[in-house]
Amino acid sequence: MTIEFFAIQLIGFLGTTLFFLSYQCRSNKTLFRVQFLSYLCYTVHLLLLGATTGGISYILNTVRSFCLSSEKHFLKSRWACGIICALQLVTLMLTWDGWWSILPVTANIAATIGGYTFSARKIRLTGMLINSPLWILYDIAVGSYAGILDEMVSEASMLISIIRFGWKNLTCDENL
């Protein structure tokens, strides 16, 4: 393992830290903003690893977080959700590199739909049951140790947030 490999993993670990902190934000708006920064780190990390589908897919996650934290009505609309999901499918077609390419795209479509419900419960459930498990498999396939840790930490963070805020208190965030 080279210094370059460790540097690439370090960029991913910064994304992991930011993503963990995102679920400790009570406001969905703040959660999406912190995730925006995390996704930027992961985009660079995955592209440097040569994981093109995951890297491009994370660019779309960055766009999604920007849209969901925006004040613009259209960016938080079902149309925007549909456009982002369609772009994920285009990414899959253009970057196909084997069956594992399906994993991040499916995960991110689920997370996009979950995010656009604006329900803290659905956001966390989608993350715990669909998004993280699929990303763990992809990260194993492409050699992203930071990604594997990120998803494990994300699972823990989502569970901690449910315990911390209480399931009943995780409802739609009216401040969006």
Residues covered by each model-derived region:
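Alpha-helical membrane-protein topology signature
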Residues: 1-176
